[in-house]
Amino acid sequence: MNLRLLLAAFALLLSCPASAETTDVAALAKQSGTPDIPGLKIVWLSPWGDVAKAHHWQNIIVHQTEGPAGSARGGAAEQHRNPTRRGVMVWVETDGTVYWAVADDLVPTHTDGADRNDNKYIDNGKTYHQVNKDTSVGVEFAGNYPDVTRPATDPQIAAWKVLVKILMARYDIPLDHVYAHNWIDFKDARYCEGCTLATLAREWGK
């Protein structure tokens, strides 16, 4: 009997860190202002407002921009000055720095209308003309210039692992609503934009 109790206590102990981590992420994600998020270096160009007043975000779209290392800062600054211009809410530099450029009650212009309908990567019956700027948080990863096939850097991947959890928790977005831009639009044939990062996010969440 004592052995059973000991094993049960040990199992409970093992489960506590994961449970605590989930609780911490959920609590952090619903805050306002400029919270410190472990594992992320965030430059808050636009602080978080009341999440209850945020736009009704249903999806996350991963973009990669043909800009050199260091271009996320400039792109985010331009986005902050003109929130609805073509671009995204969140930018990620090659060193892993995250720039929160736009308040989450505003809608930047991104995607090409979710016009992919060939089911090449996923079932586009669920995305066609639905996973677009009006429903989706955009996250832009800088640095694939001059070689568009260059993958995201290790610091970007590490930041993404934390960031995607925060975005999902803040806006109550399910894991299967994390998409690569190439999955929902016809994009550059030289590479699959956002595909590795979106796939990683879905694998991490299993």
Go through each PLM region and give its residues.
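Residue-level marker of positions within ordered structural domains that often coincide
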Residues: 7-8, 20, 67, 95, ...
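N-terminal catalytic cores of peptidoglycan-degrading enzymes
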Residues: 20-130
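Basic/polar, cationic surfaces and motifs that engage anionic cell-wall
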Residues: 20-38, 54, 130-138, 142-206
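Bacterial N-terminal signal peptides
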Residues: 7-15
